[in-house]
Amino acid sequence: MSRWKAKHDKEHYYKLAKKQNYRSRASYKLKQLDKKYSLLKPDYNVVDLGAAPGGWSQVVAETIGEEGKGQIISVDLEYIKPIDHEAYTGVKGDFTTKETQDIIIELIDGKADVVLSDAAPKLTGIKDIDNFRAYDLSMAVIEIIDNILKNNGNLIMKAFQGEAYQEIIKNLKKKFRNVKTTKPNSSRKRSAEMYVIARGFRGSKK
C-alpha cells in the first residue's frame, strides 16, 4: 500500500469518527471485528482494558443497548470521560494490580463474558525497547484474564508483530480453544498491530 493511500485511509476513519461522534477511529476496528466474528451480545458483561479515550467502550455501549442486561467496565490509568449509558462504569487504575482487578470483579458481580484490550505501550522509537514493552503489555493482559474472565469467555486484544509475537499466540492457545489473528480494514496496513480473537477460555489452571 502506498503512503498516500495509508494516509488517506487514516484520515477517512478519523473524519468518520468525528462525524459519528466516536472518540477515536479505533471504534471502527472493534465494529469491523464484531461484524466478522459476532463477539458482543446484549446481555454480556464486558471489560475494556486500557480503554482511554473510550472508543471501544462506546461501541460496546451501543451493542448492549438500553435494557441494562449487560455491563461495560472501562479501565485505564488515564481519566476516561464517562459514557452516557446506564450500563457503563469507568475505573481509573492499573489493571495489572489485584486492587483494580478486585474492583472489576465486584462491579460485574462475578466475571466477564468478554475482555477487550486495544491498549498500546508508550513507544520510544528504539526497536528492542518497544518490542519488550509491547510483549510485556500483552502478557499483562493474558495474565489478568485468569482472574476476571469467565470459563468459555472470549478475549479480543491488540498485539504487535515482533520477536515475541509468536510467544504471545502460543500462550493464548494454551488458555483458549480457538485463537485467530486478523487486521481490520481500519488498521493502517503498514502498522505492526494485529488483533487476536481468542474464544473459549479454558479457565485458570491455578
From Swiss-Prot:
Pfam families: FtsJ (PF01728)
Residues annotated as catalytic: K158
Record field: catalytic activity: uridine(2552) in 23S rRNA + S-adenosyl-L-methionine = 2'-O-methyluridine(2552) in 23S rRNA + S-adenosyl-L-homocysteine + H(+)
GO molecular function per UniProt: rRNA (uridine-2'-O-)-methyltransferase activity
The EC number(s) this enzyme carries: 2.1.1.166
InterPro entries xrefs: RNA_methyltr_RlmE (IPR050082), RNA_MeTrfase_FtsJ_dom (IPR002877), rRNA-MeTfrase_E (IPR015507), SAM-dependent_MTases_sf (IPR029063)
Enzyme class, UniProt record, top EC level: transferase
Record localization: Cytoplasm
Alphabetic keyword roster: Cytoplasm, Methyltransferase, rRNA processing, S-adenosyl-L-methionine, Transferase
Presence of keyword Membrane: no
Coiled-coil portions: none
Binding-site residues, S-adenosyl-L-methionine: G54, W56, D76, D94, D118
Cysteines engaged in disulfide bonds, as pairs: none
Gene Ontology CC, one term: cytoplasm
HAMAP family attached to this UniProt entry: RNA_methyltr_E
Family stated for the protein in its record: Belongs to the class I-like SAM-binding methyltransferase superfamily. RNA methyltransferase RlmE family.
Function: Specifically methylates the uridine in position 2552 of 23S rRNA at the 2'-O position of the ribose in the fully assembled 50S ribosomal subunit.
Protein name per Swiss-Prot or TrEMBL: Ribosomal RNA large subunit methyltransferase E
Encoding gene per record: rlmE
